[in-house]
Amino acid sequence: MKKKAVSILMTAAMAASMLATTAMAGETEASTEAFDPGTGKVYLLNFKPETDEALQTLASDYSSQYGVDVTVLTAADGQYNTTLTSEMAKSDAPTIFTVGNATAAQTWNDYTYDLKDTPLYSHLTDKSLTVNYDGKVAAIANCFESYGIIYNKTILNDYFQMDNAKAKSMDDINSFDTLKAVADDIQSRVDEINDKFGTSLTEAFASAGLDDSSSWRFSGHLANLPLYYEFKDDGVDLTAGEPTIKGTYLDNFKNVWDMYVSDSAADPKTLNSGSYNAEQEFGMGEAVFYQNGDWEFSALTNEDNGYEVKAEDLGMMPIYFGVDDANEGLCSGTENFWAINAKAPQEDIDSSLAFLNWVITSDEGRKAMVDDMGLTCPFDTFTGDYASKNAFGAEATALQSAGKTSVAWSFNATPNVDDWRKDVVNALTDYTSNGGSWDAVKTAFVDGWAHQWTLAHEGEASTEAATEAATEAE
């Protein structure tokens, strides 16, 4: 089939400009125009499990206030594409769904409503935060995120005071080699640190779980680093990628992964058991380092969770990869783009657009997005009391201001993302838990990419046909 031009218009540097634009618009108020919720139904298929509770509450409040039926279904980790395909085949299909990358924009082209002339688009502070395909704005980002290695400032500052510490301040931890030296040393001195400072430390790094609830941190977010640096070398679009990869930086991936595993109290043989909770380990002060993103800020600082860490304890550093550590910033981007189902009845389209506009303009919606979900939102309505309170997002901006280069979310290019990641996780599990060969990880990463790319980019017509057939058969 003839390929159409696809672009996810996003650059790593836009985080700073987006946040700066929002800050300068401090006096911007939410729209005061008369609100019309419409007469249709809203069905949001949510991509982010960690936002489910807040979205369910919003849906209930909106339904009570406006009499509009709002349903929120949250897909399980790693199952979004499967769930989306299944739900889209039903007569009551989602009216709002997530388009995460170029492949998704192509696959669901017939289902994406052009958002260019909507209030949602008009409120977007950075018009590059869209997925554009086939001459239309197919989807709009609902948040902008950064991830790296979360660290406990208080415990690290205690460690820096110890004799023979491998670093004396955070400024010293500016490369993979130094990070590994510090992590190795902390892991070997856990009891000494606890005795000296009264901490409850058990490990340097929180567990690197390979079950579905955690493995995406490594098959997606850690895997982003070798993809990013290879795409950069090859001079291709950093978020659109290329049909084949060489795995140039997989040895760097291995070095970081081995550090995560060896400098943790978790048993490597049981990492896929689902028995570990890395957030809890870090939140209770049992770990110094935890690879995750700014979406964790809300959970870690929520008093209801009973964690010992406080907001002032938290910092985030880049995932130093041993390639360009001196210039590397956090990994910044998004894969969370709202799309509207163009095949839904017009009244449902109108009500779905009204609901999203309410989320980004109402007090209830903005509070939920910022306070309950901990998101940094790219709309001009998120100012004043609704400006992001996420300290991790501020770290991303500070690093950019210091001249560091944010790492683009190159994993947005991943073809058939769930299938590719599953194969990588299986190989990574065999290597880590069963003494398998690292070559199998390379094969899953490199050969698996080419295979899934072929399926994704040449099989779009069959995917769409299958969905249409399922719909007609219902």
Task: Please name every model-derived segment.
Residues T74-T83, N174-T178, T270-M284:
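Short helix-initiation/N-cap motifs at beta->coil->alpha
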